[in-house]
């Protein structure tokens, strides 16, 4: 693995990857795209397999969903679960992307923070769960 980044001599037990090297060229991350061809309407609930969510709120003629959207996070009960939400259309200042908690979870450990606004055009927000009740921006 000279010149590569990865895990040498991997031995991940429960999901059984034993005795082989893993390098970053073999890693793939699930991507969900929300745009005019896959328009969820004004709400989307993060699915179990979601990791990267690309959202285009641009006008429909430009390939977007042409509306604000609320994305509901899953429970923060899985420690280390990471979700990346990207304003792929660069239009979130016009059509906001709101990220909503699940149940009684919160953001950044603040019980009164039940949602966050993603309103920076073309930016992404990375959230990671503490395994208890909070999603943290990192």
Where are these regions (language model features)?
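Small/polar loops that bind or transfer phosphate-bearing groups
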Residues: 4, 14, 119
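Residue-level detector of solvent-exposed, low-hydrophobicity positions
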Residues: 42, 51, 114-115, 123-125
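Parallel beta-helix/beta-solenoid repeats that form elongated, surface-exposed shafts/blades used
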Residues: 1-2, 9-10, 20, 113-116
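Extracellular disulfide-bonded cysteine-rich modules/repeats
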Residues: 121-131
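Terminal beta-strand-rich extracellular "head" domains
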Residues: 101-121
């Amino acid at each position: 693995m000279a010149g590569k980044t990865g895990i040498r001599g991997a031995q991940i037990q429960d999901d059984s990857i034993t005795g082989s090297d893993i390098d970053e060229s073999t890693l793939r991350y699930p991507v969900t795209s929300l745009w005019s061809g896959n328009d969820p309407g004004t709400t989307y609930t993060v699915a179990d397999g979601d990791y990267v969510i690309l959202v285009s709120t641009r006008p429909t003629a430009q390939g977007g969903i042409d509306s604000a959207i609320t994305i509901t996070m899953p429970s923060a009960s899985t420690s280390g679960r990471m979700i990346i939400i990207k304003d792929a259309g660069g239009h979130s200042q016009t059509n906001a992307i709101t990220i909503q908690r699940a149940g009684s979870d919160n953001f950044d450990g603040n019980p009164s923070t039940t949602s966050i606004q993603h309103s920076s055009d073309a930016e992404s927000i990375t959230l990671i769960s503490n395994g208890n009740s909070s999603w943290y921006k990192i």
